Amino acid sequence: MDEEPSGPSLDMPATAEPSSSETDKGVSPVLAAIDKSSSMEEEPGPDRATTPPVWERGGPTGGTQQGASPAPDSGHSGPGHTLGPTSTVSGTSEDLRPTRRRPPPGKQIPCSSPGCCLSFPSVRDLAQHLRTHCPPKQSLEGKLFRCSALSCTETFPNMQELVAHGKLHYKPNRYFKCENCLLRIRTHRSLFKHLHVCAEHAQSPAPPPPPPALDRESPASERPPESDPAPAPGLPYPLLEPFTTPAPAPTGPFLPYLNPAPFGLSPPRLRPFLAAAPGPPASSAAVWKKSQGAGGSPRRPQGGSDAPSGHAAPSRIVWEHTRGRYSCMQCAFSTASRPAMTLHLEDHRPGGPAAPAPGQPRPDAPADPAPLAPKASPLLSEGECPVFSPL
């Protein structure tokens, strides 16, 4: 019994060494209550005392003595032995964990800022000190931002207002150019509105307007259907030679089958268009194919449905723009200037001085299909005649 209190006396301060057994008995009720609470919270209390290798950090002598003393204490529950386990638990929570994260106590951490010789006992104090070296970035009071333009003396309190002001000096270099008057317009919507006015002033008093519509490529895409004198687009043979030779007009019972009249017109009303051949260059085949793909416009027979072929000239006036040149679709005239082509188209109008000028003469009355009868033989030899031979 005399050797038992020697074990815990190593963990106690120097003032507790001369204490007698009576003082231990006087403190025993309080320590007993603490021991009970610790045993309720941590059930493996005796096992904690049986793990002495953690105390090898304190030194070889202290580790051997502490490791030897708790071995007999694990089986005893005396009041004097409760101080040993509590000291070991407090030692593991205070000394073991901090040694991995913090420097040993008493070591000062110097400031890493240049010119600063201060040192601090903890990392938290050092972090608070570093804030004095790195203040948050803020604009100085009274600082003004000046515009960099040469003739501008505006100043602004912040950068956001300066950037918004800079847009007034550096607008995007974008514009939409009118093809008729070469006017530069800022927005695309304004270009549409301008094309209506520009087309009305550019065209002549004639009813059919030759200038383009709203789209830039509309002259080549919309006008060819009106100038097309060929039969219905369902036939494959006009694609081979659309304008070089007159379109054939079959006679007899084959006319209703070969010309289904997709625009609601009877075959006799289509004969003026089949007989009249404009005769422009063969380079317009691409325009004809493009109009076929887009679907024939119902306005194609306009001007020639109830009128003779001579009055159908306004609907046949078209031009083609390829490789920077404008080519007339009724004659061999070509130019690189749009106004020159517009003036040339006035000659093909019915009221113009040279209305019958283009290539081949046009008949004034609906042509008789009899002269075209010999031309129907090559068409019938390509497979059309055997189909309708029983009829």
From Swiss-Prot:
Q: Where is this region: Disordered?
A: 1-110, 201-243, 274-312, 344-391
List the keywords (alphabetical).
DNA-binding, Metal-binding, Nucleus, Repeat, Transcription, Transcription regulation, Zinc, Zinc-finger
Where on the tree of life does the source sit, at the highest rank? Eukaryota
Q: Which residues form a coiled coil?
A: none
Output compositional bias ranges, type Low complexity. 274-286
What molecular functions are annotated in GO for this chain? DNA binding; zinc ion binding
One family name in Pfam for this protein:
zf-C2H2_8
User: Which parts of this protein are zinc fingers (C2H2-type)?
Assistant: 109-133, 145-169, 176-201, 326-348
**How is this protein annotated for GO cellular component?**
nucleus
Bias category Basic and acidic residues: which stretches? 214-226
Q: Where in the cell is it found?
A: Nucleus
| Xref: Gene3D superfamilies | Classic Zinc Finger
- Record family assignment: Belongs to the krueppel C2H2-type zinc-finger protein family.
Function (record text): May be involved in transcriptional regulation.
Q: Specify the protein name.
A: Zinc finger protein 414
